[in-house]
Structure formats: C-alpha cells, structure tokens
C-alpha cells in the first residue's frame, strides 16, 4: 500500500481528480483540512478565543502543523499542488519539509509557475502539470505499467 499526502491549494478539485483516478490502485490518501474556515478557526475552537487575530491565527497554524507534520511523516509520497491564484506559502513550506525528510515529492503546477518554482521543482522527483499525470506516476510506481 502506498501512502500519499496531498498538499497545496484548496480552491479547485485537483485532489478529487487524483483520488478518483487512483481508485483502482492500492493507495491511501491523506491531506490537510480543506475547509478553510475550520482550518483557520481550529485553534480557537479547541483552545479558546483570542482577541488578537495574530494569536487566533497562531493557534490554528500550530494545530494544523501537528496534522501536517504527521501526514507528511507517514507518507511514502507527497504531492504538492501550486494553483493559479493566491500566494501559496503553505504549499511551499510543505514541499520544503517533505524534501528535508527525504520524501518522494511530486510537484503539480501549470507551466506559468515554472520559473517561480524552479528551486522547488529541482527538489522534486517529478513535476506534473495535470492531476492525471500524478495518477499515472502512482500507477507506474505501484504496477510498473505505462499509460
């Protein structure tokens, strides 16, 4: 069984495309909480309200980091998606963390981001532009079969 952590942007259905495409493979997927409000507010919901947004955000970030660290540590493969909009600092951090742990890293982004992400891409074992390519990488890793 291959354990795959899906990190990165939360505004498109790329995760669902990969999970659906890999449903016939022996893969278990995990990832961050993708409900933006729940992710932002988990700290204060669990540990209590804060009057200052800095501490509100810090509590959430730290609890989310526990989940992220465990997910990446447990994974055999980490896929990090950089989407078309927003500054995706969390995705970049997750990619660096996974690389530092020696995880097999697949980066997913459009050609428009190739220059900006060249160092991140250089740390990856594969750089894909479509979720279907990630599925085919997983299929090849598990079965040795080409598309």
Predicted features along the sequence, with ranges:
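Conserved catalytic or regulatory cores that recognize and/or transform ribose-phosphate-containing ligands
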Residues: 1-147
């Amino acid at each position: 069984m291959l354990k795959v952590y899906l990190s990165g942007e939360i505004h498109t259905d790329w995760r669902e495309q990969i999970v659906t495409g890999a449903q016939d493979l022996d893969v278990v997927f995990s990832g961050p909480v993708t409900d933006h409000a729940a992710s932002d507010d988990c700290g204060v919901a669990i540990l209590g309200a804060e009057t200052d947004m800095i501490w509100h955000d810090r509590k959430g970030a730290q609890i989310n980091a526990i989940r992220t660290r465990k997910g990446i540590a447990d994974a055999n493969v980490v896929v990090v998606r950089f989407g078309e909009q927003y500054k995706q600092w969390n995705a970049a951090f997750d990619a660096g963390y996974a690389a530092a742990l020696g995880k097999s890293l697949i980066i997913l982004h459009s050609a428009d981001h190739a220059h900006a992400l060249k160092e991140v891409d250089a740390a990856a074992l594969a750089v894909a532009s479509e979720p279907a390519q990630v599925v085919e990488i997983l299929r090849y890793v598990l079965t040795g079969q080409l598309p």
